[in-house]
Regions:
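Auxiliary Fe-S-binding modules of radical SAM enzymes
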Residues: 131-200
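Short, well-ordered beta-to-alpha junction loops that form the rim of enzyme active sites
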Residues: 12, 120-121, 191
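Contiguous N-terminal and early-domain "leader" segments and peripheral loops that mark the onset or edge
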Residues: 3, 65-67, 171
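A structural signal for short coil/turn segments at secondary-structure junctions
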Residues: 1-2, 33, 112, 180
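Conserved AdoMet/S-adenosylmethionine-binding subsite of the radical SAM
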Residues: 16-148
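Short Fe-S-cluster ligation motifs
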Residues: 1-12
């Protein structure tokens, strides 16, 4: 399709868990479609180790999913973190993830890469914490923030947890918009989506 101007890798899973294949895919895309914009989405755990590669490949936009900046809150969002061959649970895993996310964002901004953070908003878990995330995002120099409503999914920890209403998300975006610009056109694309936003 001639109307495709962006190629992004977002999953399923975290693309940087298999960084070699992800980066090679970007290399191949850049080789044959040099005009397209390259975007990467990640939880940030492995990103610090590959920031130079990301910059060298001309990946201009990176999204980091940041659902908390406080480990006490993050431990209620993430059941475990697998890092350097070990599994960490609870506060230990949360601390590692948040430290790596912060390092990712700082290093990406040092390379002048556009950084967006995605925050999945979960009532009674991190919703009241979102303004603090936005304030920290401003301090990091994040370019854009996307507040995403959590959708309960069967057989997951939040399957019986309500998601935020559209009004709650809209109010949140208005409340924190003075910290960092808010993305409002997200269509929650599948990882294998192809086409325009209006086709999502």
């Amino acid at each position: 399709r001639q109307d495709i101007s962006v190629v992004g890798i977002a999953g399923p899973g975290d693309p940087m868990c298999d960084a070699d294949k992800t980066l090679e895919t970007f290399r191949l895309v850049k080789k044959d479609f040099s005009h397209v914009m390259l975007c990467l989405s990640s939880n940030g755990l492995a990103v610090p180790d590959y920031v130079n590669d990301i910059a060298d490949l001309g990946i201009t936009h990176v999204t980091i999913t940041a659902n908390a900046i406080d480990p006490e809150i993050a431990k209620n969002v993430y059941s475990m973190v697998r890092y350097e061959g070990n599994i960490y649970k609870g506060i230990d895993g949360a601390r590692i993830l948040l430290e790596r996310q912060a390092e990712s964002i700082r290093k990406l901004k040092e390379k002048n890469i556009i950084v967006k953070i995605n925050t999945v908003v979960v009532p009674d878990v991190n919703m009241d914490h979102v303004p603090a995330i936005a304030k920290q995002a401003e301090a990091w120099g994040v370019d854009l923030m996307n507040c995403i409503a959590m959708i309960p999914v069967h057989d997951t920890v939040f399957e019986n947890h309500r998601g935020p209403t559209s009004e709650e998300i809209d109010n949140m975006r208005q409340f924190i918009g003075h910290y960092v610009p808010q993305m409002t056109h997200c269509k929650r694309c599948r990882a294998d989506a192809i086409g325009r936003l209006c086709e999502a």
